Amino acid sequence: MAQNSLRLVEDKSVDKSKALEAALSQIERSFGKGSIMKLGSNENVVEVETVSTGSLSLDIALGIGGLPKGRIIEIYGPESSGKTTLALQTIAEAQKKGGICAFVDAEHALDPVYARKLGVDLQSLLISQPDTGEQALEITDTLVRSGAVDVLVIDSVAALTPRAEIEGEMGDSLPGLQARLMSQALRKLTASISKSKCMVIFINQIRMKIGVMFGSPETTTGGNALKFYASVRLDIRRIGAVKEREEVVGNQTRVKVVKNKMAPPFKQVEFDIMYGEGVSKTGELVDLGVKAGIVEKSGAWFSYNSQRLGQGRENAKTFLRDNPDTANEIELALRQNAGLIADRFLQNGGPDAGEGDDGSDEG
């Protein structure tokens, strides 16, 4: 009796594998080769290509060395917090690797002089200033489907005004129109973004919800669809000023990885954004270097490999700016210890310390 039942189980497993093979071949005949496969059989599917954000500490906090290609990214925060700066720095990094980038300027507020200062190559940057939200998203869809664009930035979701609102009267109430537009666009975009390996960055603004008694009253514009479709969400805030004597020369900025489908979320980093320069790379090297024990700090003096960098943080930054070889050595050492730095030294903001709706948004 036992032998009969054993044979029956074996027959079932053979039947299952045959049925699976038949189903797979039928799917491939109907939808083309590669429409279904075993995930481990193609190494290119498993490994995710990334583009640096221009901030070493943020690259480490993201867990994969930058922002993932073929995914949707959302960067949100208050006014003048550095959202567009971070997006432009990502474009500059992609262009350094030979990538083609596009900027959909729905706010009609891009400053080309500032973009050039951040390292953006304006000659090869594609720019569009659409009149309506539908036009902006149609342009985005066409560029993504072309398969030729590596990074596309939409600035911003709040400025994607539906055509019905523009053609209507001032004061007309059109509830949920923008949210429906975003939901439909993301449904269409998500598959072509993945296939074309194009990273689409949505910059978003924040609004206040009325009557919230518990939790954060902040929310982002454009409904909830973007929160679900985004693989990475970054909350960027200005937390202070960088001063030289009495003059303010930059912002102290905190970025929290609110959602991350590629690595553990809720990592939090702080860095300086200098006016007319962007993210202070040398400042990050000094701060992260000290935390990781690569740069030694004795009193006010900073040193690396027994070589003095300077007295005080600003002097150490100046030394690294003037000596790029030393700066590159420190950066290489930090990138080699990225996992250790992320686990030990980057603050974990926790799920509650972000935007109101987002407690459970870890991939």
Curated annotation (Swiss-Prot):
Location within or outside the cell: Cytoplasm
Any one GO biological process: DNA recombination
InterPro entries xrefs: AAA+_ATPase, DNA_recomb/repair_RecA, DNA_recomb/repair_RecA_CS, P-loop_NTPase, RecA-like_C, RecA-like_N, RecA_ATP-bd, RecA_C_sf
MF annotations from Gene Ontology: ATP binding; ATP hydrolysis activity; ATP-dependent DNA damage sensor activity; damaged DNA binding; single-stranded DNA binding
SMART domains the UniProt entry points to: AAA
Family: Belongs to the RecA family.
Protein's job: Can catalyze the hydrolysis of ATP in the presence of single-stranded DNA, the ATP-dependent uptake of single-stranded DNA by duplex DNA, and the ATP-dependent hybridization of homologous single-stranded DNAs. It interacts with LexA causing its activation and leading to its autocatalytic cleavage.
Protein name per Swiss-Prot or TrEMBL: Protein RecA
The species this protein was found in: Agrobacterium fabrum (strain C58 / ATCC 33970) (Agrobacterium tumefaciens (strain C58))
Gene name linked to the record: recA
